[in-house]
Amino acid sequence: MKSVSSVVLATLLAVNANANPFEGFDIVDLTHAFDANTIYWPTEKDFKHTESFAGETEGGWYYSAFSVQTAEHGGTHLDAPVHFAQGRWSADQIPTAKLFSAAVVIDVKAKTANNPDYRLSVEDIRAWELQHGQIPKGATVLMNTGFSMRWPNRLEYLGTAERGPEAVRSLHFPGFSKASAEFLAHERDITAVGLDTASIDYGQSTDFIVHRLLYERNILGFENIANLDALPPVGAWLIALPMKIADGSGAPLRIVGLVPAAR
């Protein structure tokens, strides 16, 4: 069976050279902008955007340039498998075809509204499949917790506004369960998982078992995604393009959804 990434690439290549290959799709930005309010793990430093020059030059034209400083894991970003699995793909080693996939969106907002420690269950996945069919080969499974609506309020989004190693024990946000990770890793042939919280493991995790299970199999992770409500449960495509950092355990990510336009 062909993977969904090969199917979508073949479809785009088959389009008339003079036609817009994205005609018929609404393009949804699923990325939080990087700025002074960007949320990082409590042990990481904030994003810095430092002006080198901005203004009129001696020649009379406008010119601006800035430098940036960022941790790999903050804002909307990629977790490369090597983040928790030695010898697996780093950010620059991920095959390009893995960055194009079908989107499977599992909405659990009703369950996370009063339970910030909720974890996606196998039952949630099976309920989605009962309605929409089996998760297609090569898909990205997205968990829509509704937490992106809390961005960039650190207290509401992370469960704590504290910083430093001692703050980690106070984190409260949803993630995938160990059982759901095992099911996706062994029973379904997926490319990636993603969600609109700071980690694919829930905030109170101390063993990061979801990271370890998935990344050992070179399954990618996308964290701090925005606007998942704009995607349907099935039928959309993802383009997820991380910064190509050599040996990177992760990278800032620009991720967009292609949603079939209503006719």
What are these regions (language model features)?
Residues 1-4:
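Positively charged n-region of N-terminal signal peptides that target proteins for export
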Residues 19-263:
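Active-/binding-site microenvironments in catalytic and ligand-binding cores
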Residues 6-16:
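Bacterial N-terminal signal peptides
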